[in-house]
Amino acid sequence: MEEEMLIPEEEYQKSGVHIGTQVKSSDMKPYIFKIRNDGLYILDVKKTNSKLIAAGKMLARFDPQDILVVAQRQYAFRPVAKFAEVTGAVSITGRFNPGTLTNPSLKFYKEVKVIVVTDPLADVQAMKEAIKIGIPIIALCDANNKTDFVDLVIPTNNKGRRSLAVIYWLLAREILKNRGTITSYDQFKYTIDDFEAQI
């Protein structure tokens, strides 16, 4: 039985969620839909959709303050900050200071139980520390990402302004629905534009 699409397939595509990279890692092979004539790998949005549903269920089981979401990429700053505001999660955008998760004597130390990374490549310091302390890792992974140590892969264009807004908007909505904070999607009063980085 096919899972319900959180938004129409065309909406994922219009937002560029399916646009991968011209380099593919073997780890991401299961999430590739096709390769375009120009060599660009296209991601399977049905798998993106399915993984968002799974991530929403998983994250809803954690207390909000136990969820950390990180982003080094500038286009992800606003989506991540808005996601944190809407869900109550903790966010770090920009530089991830070494020791944030591993050194309790630091003033910026964070004690969390799960992490969401926007790009395993860009957010490598956060990844290393999450692995070291053994907390689950959810990662937005593009066609070129390695997925070692990632517990839940969300295959998506993790570089595009609109695609990042859509992914974090959907993930926030799914968490609130699974928590019972909202009982229907109509009650989610935020728009994708609220999550999108400004140019």
Swiss-Prot record:
Q: Which InterPro entries match?
A: Ribosomal_uS2, Ribosomal_uS2_arc, Ribosomal_uS2_euk/arc, Ribosomal_uS2_flav_dom_sf
**UniProt keyword annotations, A-Z:** Ribonucleoprotein, Ribosomal protein
For whether the record's keyword set contains Ribosomal protein, the answer is: yes
**Coiled-coil residues:** none
* Swiss-Prot/TrEMBL GO biological process terms: translation
Query: What Pfam family is a match for this entry?
Result: Ribosomal_S2
Q: What GO molecular functions are on record for this protein?
A: structural constituent of ribosome
A GO cellular component term found in this entry reads: small ribosomal subunit
Matching SUPFAM superfamilies, A to Z? Ribosomal protein S2
Name the family the entry cites: Belongs to the universal ribosomal protein uS2 family.
- Give the matching PANTHER family: 40S RIBOSOMAL PROTEIN SA
- Its name, as the record gives it, is Small ribosomal subunit protein uS2
Gene that produces this protein: rps2
